[in-house]
């Protein structure tokens, strides 16, 4: 495992409120090729950070969308998926999701419904792309995967091994994330913002009157004396 060189501040998700930052999460069973897809897309220009404390791998990427420079963080599960559930912070402030299954392992396709249900619990509105990975057999692309059709989700046939459709997949995911951020306010974002505002109000109310008044300066007798 790579050394964890990440400072705590680098996991501050407040940065995703900035206009030029987006967060894209990857979901799916173990060994479906999520990490391999990201590495294929980023090629040699990536330095994945293993955040062992948070059980995730963070991939940073800079993209250009409509002439704007966008800083993209791709979040990978780094083993959490073996528990068939992710921590709520993994979904927090995500702007798009890439959900992957292995066309050669039917169980990974069946488990998409579990991942999608959890995604919508935390992020009801963000765009989600379904990815059929490991299409070594071209006949696979002729199969009908009804899950994507059922939920009106885009379906991409890709191969991490030879790169088929990988660049298009990630570029489209970035564009969807940017578009979502510009044009929509997720219900869960509103809830989190309300909770943050409430916490700040509570902190202000808890400050003792003596502490609040301690910053008010009163003139000393020496300063008030006309003979000083």
Swiss-Prot record:
Belongs to the small GTPase superfamily. Rab family. GO terms for cellular component: centriole; ciliary basal body; cytoplasm; endomembrane system; pericentriolar material. The keyword GTP-binding applies. Interacts (in its GTP-bound form) with CEP19 (via residues 121-150); this interaction is required for its localization to the mother centriole and cilium basal body. Interacts (in its GTP-bound form) with the intraflagellar transport (IFT) complex B (via the IFT74-IFT81 heterodimer). Binding to CEP19 and the IFT74-IFT81 heterodimer is mutually exclusive. Expressed in the testis. InterPro entries: P-loop_NTPase (IPR027417), RabL2 (IPR041835), Small_GTP-bd (IPR005225), Small_GTPase (IPR001806). One of its GO terms (biological process) is intraciliary transport. Transmembrane segments: none annotated. Keywords: Cell projection, Cilium, Cilium biogenesis/degradation, Cytoplasm, Cytoskeleton, GTP-binding, Nucleotide-binding. Residues 200-228 are annotated as: Disordered. Changing residue 35 to N: GDP-locked form; mild defects in ciliary assembly. Loss of interaction with the intraflagellar transport (IFT) complex B via the IFT74-IFT81 heterodimer. Loss of interaction with CEP19. Loss of localization to the centrosome. It comes from the Eukaryota. Small GTPase required for ciliation. Activated in a guanine nucleotide exchange factor (GEF)-independent manner via its intrinsic GDP for GTP nucleotide exchange ability. Involved in ciliary assembly by binding the intraflagellar transport (IFT) complex B from the large pool pre-docked at the base of the cilium and thus triggers its entry into the cilia. It is found in: Cytoplasm, Cytoskeleton, Microtubule organizing center, Centrosome, Centriole; Cytoplasm, Cytoskeleton, Cilium basal body; Cytoplasm. The keyword Cytoplasm applies. This is Rab-like protein 2B. GO terms for molecular function: GTP binding; GTPase activity. GTP binds at residues 28-35, 76-80, 133-136. PANTHER family: PTHR47978.
